Each structure stands twice: as C-alpha cells, then as structure tokens.
Curated annotation (Swiss-Prot):
Lineage: Bacteria, Pseudomonadati, Pseudomonadota, Alphaproteobacteria, Caulobacterales
Gene of this entry: rplU
Protein name, entry field: Large ribosomal subunit protein bL21
Record function comment: This protein binds to 23S rRNA in the presence of protein L20.
Cysteine pairs bridged by disulfides in the record: none
Compositional bias ranges of the Basic residues kind: 154-163
Taxonomic source organism: Caulobacter vibrioides (strain ATCC 19089 / CIP 103742 / CB 15)
Subunit structure: Part of the 50S ribosomal subunit. Contacts protein L20.
Signal peptide stretch: none
Length: 171
C-alpha cells in the first residue's frame, strides 16, 4: 500500500518502511510524526484519489534526525565590472522513517526497528574503533559558565598632544 502525501509544499510517494527527507519538522529524534494531508492512496490496481485529500487517511512516521542539507551556491556577477560575489546556504531538513500508511479501512505497517544511534558512534564503528573509543568522542553537554568576577575598571584615555607650532616668518 502506498500514499502520496503533501508536506513542506512538496508531494512525496511513500510506503511503510520508506526513509523520507522533508523540509524541517519540529520535534526531537524519536518523536512520532503524522502526515494528515494524504492526496492519494493506492494498493495494486485500486487507487483512491482525494478531492483534495482522502478522508480518514493518515501516514505515520518517526523523526530520525534533523540536519542541514547540501549547500546551495549563490553566485552574483556583473560582467566587465570586476564584481563577483559567492555565498552559500544550507537548508535544514528532517529525516523521517514511515512506519504506517492507513486509510480506506486498510493499514500497512512497517515491522522493523528504529535505531537512533548517533552518527558519531556509527562513524567510529565504521572506522573499526569500536564502541570503547566512542565515549571520548561524544562531546559532553555544555553547562552554563559561572558568572565572571567584577570586571577591572577601564583605563582612561591618554591626553591629546598639543599641535606643533610652525614658524610664520618664512614664506
């Protein structure tokens, strides 16, 4: 069973178990996400098209991570003027695992397990360092710094020097 959903101004065709990269969604990793704007449901030859959405249909998922996407380069140029500017921008995106597609009295569920292992640990395992090296690589949560002691008074500015006098007798 598949569905066509709309989120972030874009449409996606999804099935249970799919990994979906969408515009940024609010929530922590592991949070449940529901997409209620289902435009179409399909199973084999049977297709249900909504007008504009299918009533009672919902696609559920789990938020895996929120990250920055690929960099988009912005290049401005005015020819023959020596004017060139390059900037870049990375949009936030969320990765969602679709866990179920439900509607029209039917439901398709994904039977897998969701692993929320941080990327740092996965990278260490891939390099063959094992889990023993991982705790040293994960940064500890930053606590608020203690308030600074009373700041020293600022120094006074040095007095300005008098302008040098010139002799007016020579012309």
């Amino acid at each position: 069973m598949y569905a066509v959903i709309k989120t972030g101004g874009k449409q996606y065709r999804v099935q249970a178990g799919d990994l979906l990269v969408v515009e940024k969604l609010e929530g922590e990793p592991g949070a449940a996400v529901a997409f209620g704007e289902v435009l179409m449901l399909g199973e084999g030859e049977a297709v249900t098209v909504g007008a504009p959405t299918v009533d009672g249909a919902v696609v559920s998922g789990t938020l895996l991570e929120t990250r920055k996407g690929e960099k988009v380069k912005i290049f401005k140029k005015i020819r023959r003027q020596g004017y060139r500017r390059t900037r870049g921008h990375r949009q936030f995106e969320s990765v969602v695992r679709v866990t179920s597609v439900a509607g029209a009295g039917k439901e398709a569920k994904w039977e897998g397990t969701i692993d929320l292992t941080p990327k740092v640990i996965l990278d260490a395992r891939a390099r063959g360092l094992g889990d023993a090296a991982v705790p040293a690589t994960i940064p500890a949560p930053v606590e608020a710094a203690p308030a600074k002691a009373e700041a020293a008074p600022k120094k006074k500015a040095a007095p300005k020097k008098a302008a040098a006098k010139t002799e007016e007798g020579e012309a």
